[in-house]
Amino acid sequence: MLDLFNKTSQVQGRISAWLASNNLPHRPLGFDYQGVETLQIKPEDWPSIAVALYVNGFNYLRCQCGYDVYPGGPLASVYYLTKVDDNVDQPEEVCIKIFVPRENPKIPSIFWVWKTADYQERETYDMLGIVYESHPNLKRILMPESWLGWPLRKDYITPDFYELQDAY
């Protein structure tokens, strides 16, 4: 999963070059179809890189989500950051991907950098089981607290019986 982390085969963008000039470890993954630069970050490096990006002007966490890469494989947490500035027609964006093993998946929470990560990290925890360390209220947000398993994992087995509770 991360054994190719230091091998760079993608073209570096502006943000990747800036991170490299500041000796911040990352791996460029190229650009998406809209031209947004995508970077891979290791979980242990995420807090310092998140703060560096925030200080560099990426003041808006547009979206945080997660996905199961393939059955039995790693889980991914994805962050879309935007540099919101006055009088800018095209705001600068970056996509950060963090891959973790499905056994004991842990990533440091960036709630303390971008408050909008609160519910988004909770939803990813609820659906995929990625634990966001130091999150102030990491508990299920969509599923009942008694729910077993992580519904968006590709190896999730749907229960045969659901107990429906009447609201009245």
From Swiss-Prot:
The record gives the membrane topology as: Peripheral membrane protein
Please state the protein's primary subcellular location: plastid
A GO term from the CC aspect: chloroplast thylakoid membrane
Question: A Gene Ontology MF term for this entry?
Answer: NADH dehydrogenase (ubiquinone) activity
Q: Which GO terms describe its biological process?
A: photosynthesis, light reaction
UniProt enzyme class: translocase
Q: Which SUPFAM superfamilies match?
A: Nqo5-like
Entry keyword NADP: yes
Q: Which UniProt keywords apply?
A: Chloroplast, Membrane, NAD, NADP, Plastid, Plastoquinone, Quinone, Thylakoid, Translocase, Transport
Is the keyword tRNA processing in the record? no
The subcellular localization recorded is: Plastid, Chloroplast thylakoid membrane
Catalytic activity line of the entry: a plastoquinone + NADH + (n+1) H(+)(in) = a plastoquinol + NAD(+) + n H(+)(out); a plastoquinone + NADPH + (n+1) H(+)(in) = a plastoquinol + NADP(+) + n H(+)(out)
EC no. given is: 7.1.1.-
| Self-association state and partner proteins as the record states | NDH is composed of at least 16 different subunits, 5 of which are encoded in the nucleus.
Q: Which family does the record assign?
A: Belongs to the complex I 30 kDa subunit family.
This molecule's function is given as: NDH shuttles electrons from NAD(P)H:plastoquinone, via FMN and iron-sulfur (Fe-S) centers, to quinones in the photosynthetic chain and possibly in a chloroplast respiratory chain. The immediate electron acceptor for the enzyme in this species is believed to be plastoquinone. Couples the redox reaction to proton translocation, and thus conserves the redox energy in a proton gradient.
Fetch the HAMAP family from UniProt.
Answer: NDH1_NuoC
What's the name of the protein?
Answer: NAD(P)H-quinone oxidoreductase subunit J, chloroplastic
Q: What is the lineage of its organism?
A: Eukaryota, Viridiplantae, Streptophyta, Coleochaetophyceae, Coleochaetales
